[in-house]
């Protein structure tokens, strides 16, 4: 009798508030999705920072020596003879010479002619080649001009502690003894710096052998290993607001810029961890990401605490990233991700009757394209994804859906350190009744501040925010901010009139040598939901330290 009563009570609660918990934003699958989004957001920020460092990279060459005035001696130019060339045509040289033939000229005029020939070399992209005036006795108006077409000599890689020489050298069209085009080398340098975390500077110098040019490639590698410890209060009320994290990142595990990463997350009701590995494919920035994550969540607050609610989820995926345009003003990337996920939720885990409520199996196929545009003082980023989802639920029924996802970010900076930024996220879906890990949630520090994490959810929705940041000290390590956030969700489970959030607030960010802190006071401007009144303010806090 007691077992039957427990089952009846449990079933009743499952059909009311428990159902909302199972399909809400605080179960293991949904939390894991939010964690993956946060990691992707950080990856994009890191990429933008790396792009900023690489935008002005170019091959450096020794400065030419200045010519002294040599206009005192003149003669009539009859003919110019050139040494053999593999780059310049007879017609191109003759066009330059014709301007001076049958004229009284000085050595200054000959030097001007040589400068025009050298400019022609530069226009063709051969900065290692030059024309010069060899020692000679000018007889009957005939001038000899030498054409020194420098060939590639030694290519030296310097300061590459965690990057193989071959990884760098094979990225450039430099062959010993060849006439290499410097413009092409510059293009490859820009591309390399745009698709790698290690940044290069290249300098040309006279080769150790006559007629050759040596290249010194200096590598500026970021810190190879980093251990970060983080804490915040941006967790879920049902599983613990305070969360602790440990992140480990090795940027070049086997010295070929293959990155390994590992993270662990803990709160009072959550244990989560994940790992990943990135393998470069070739030398054009194509990368293959392998990722695995796991999340176990227990309900520690609310009506279901005494009965017990536990959810488990894991996800394994592979992503191919292909940059197809990288230059000083833009970075375009296309990619494809496959992801497999399984999520389970049990009710009554603290009773003698344990019931499986959710048992979902997902296969997702996600093509995407992203664009980053760099202005003089601004950045615009937008990513477009199509998420093709196949879901099998507890009953064995399958359902297919397609989600369109948009992620955008814009920032404008001024010389005084002030910045104005805006972000936008949106999702459209082809069907209702999505699983929690594919729904769109709003609320939280990375969404609409002033509200609990994933406070509202639906099949479709969007968020937008506007933020102004102002430095408070000369070093710009202390910054104040103010913001306005807005979000709205749509779908079959959304209650009309209670489907949007809006907030404003202020914050303070501090950046120290190995530590950063963020304190934000969010003020929800809409506070009445389901007959309950939210607090007038909500504090979001995080601290991050690097070892």
Regions found by a protein language model. Give the residues of each.
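Periplasmic polypeptide-binding modules associated with outer-membrane biogenesis and secretion
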Residues: 22-233, 264-272, 424-426
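Extracellular loop and loop/strand-boundary signature of outer-membrane beta-barrel proteins
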Residues: 177, 233-234, 261-262, 301-307, ...
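Feature captures outer-membrane beta-barrel proteins of Gram-negative bacteria and organelles
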Residues: 244-253, 271-292, 314-323, 365-373, ...
